[in-house]
């Protein structure tokens, strides 16, 4: 291995150590309570060394958030069968939202950073970097529109509203499990499936009033 290759590998290892330390601290103490100095102390680096890799704490979070959303995208593509165009849209939708719950179990630290701590920076501030997240959402709302067109949901339903309702259903089970709020003997997986199925059943009936959500992305 040449000198440049070794230096690059060492730099990548250091950046990884910074991100891992920051992720653990953000989850344990809350984003607003963590400083660059605290991250540096955890890995026994100087704050100046951290700044040579990431200009700010926000940049560290955005790097972690990008990793998390890419992990979510990868798992969604695997679980929902993105390449199976013959699959009914409603099955694809069900799998996609169940995958959010699975992701919260597989990567709880990333899930907490992405969806729980509201003191973190909004990813919309880095518009180009997170374009793939908007694309992921667009693909899902397109599938929802396909399901509406097939009659799986009430004609004229707003795909954005359906997206929000199903996200709330999946997030509820995620949060109860993550915050250790499950009832004694209650099964989180069963709750996630039941909640999403109940939401899908209700969406087939439709809404008695109109609602237009504001996009968070």
Task: Write out the residue ranges for each language-model feature.
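Conserved hydrophobic residue
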Residues: 31, 153, 179-183
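Generic hydrophobic, amphipathic alpha-helix propensity
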Residues: 14-22, 39, 64-76, 140
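Amphipathic alpha-helical packing segments from all-alpha helical-bundle domains
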Residues: 70, 74-77, 124-150, 160-165, ...
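Amphipathic C-terminal alpha-helical segment
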Residues: 102-106, 146, 166-185, 199-211
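Hydrophobic alpha-helical connector segments
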Residues: 63, 77-109, 159-166, 212-214
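Helix-turn-helix
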Residues: 17, 21, 25-59, 63
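N-terminal intrinsically disordered/low-complexity leader segments
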Residues: 1-13, 207-217
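Amphipathic alpha-helical segments used for helix-helix packing
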Residues: 105-124, 175-179
């Amino acid at each position: 291995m040449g000198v440049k290759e070794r230096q690059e590998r060492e730099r990548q290892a250091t950046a990884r150590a910074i991100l891992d330390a920051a992720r653990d601290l953000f989850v344990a103490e809350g984003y607003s309570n963590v400083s660059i100095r605290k991250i540096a102390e955890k890995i026994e680096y100087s704050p100046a060394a951290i700044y040579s890799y990431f200009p700010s704490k926000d940049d560290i979070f955005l790097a972690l958030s990008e990793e998390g959303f890419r992990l979510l995208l990868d798992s969604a593509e695997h679980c929902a069968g993105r390449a199976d165009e013959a699959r009914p849209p409603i099955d694809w939708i069900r799998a996609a939202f169940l995958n959010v719950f699975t992701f919260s179990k597989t990567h709880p630290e990333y899930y907490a950073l992405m969806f729980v701590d509201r003191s973190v920076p909004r990813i919309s501030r880095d518009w180009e970097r997170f374009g793939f997240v908007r694309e992921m959402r667009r693909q899902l709302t397109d599938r929802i529109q396909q399901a509406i067109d097939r009659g799986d949901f009430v004609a004229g339903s707003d795909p954005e509203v359906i997206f929000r309702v199903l996200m709330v259903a999946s997030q509820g089970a995620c949060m109860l499990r993550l915050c250790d709020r499950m009832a004694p003997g209650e099964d989180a997986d069963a709750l996630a499936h039941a909640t999403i199925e109940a939401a899908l059943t209700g969406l087939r009936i439709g809404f008695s009033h109109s609602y237009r959500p504001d996009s968070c992305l």
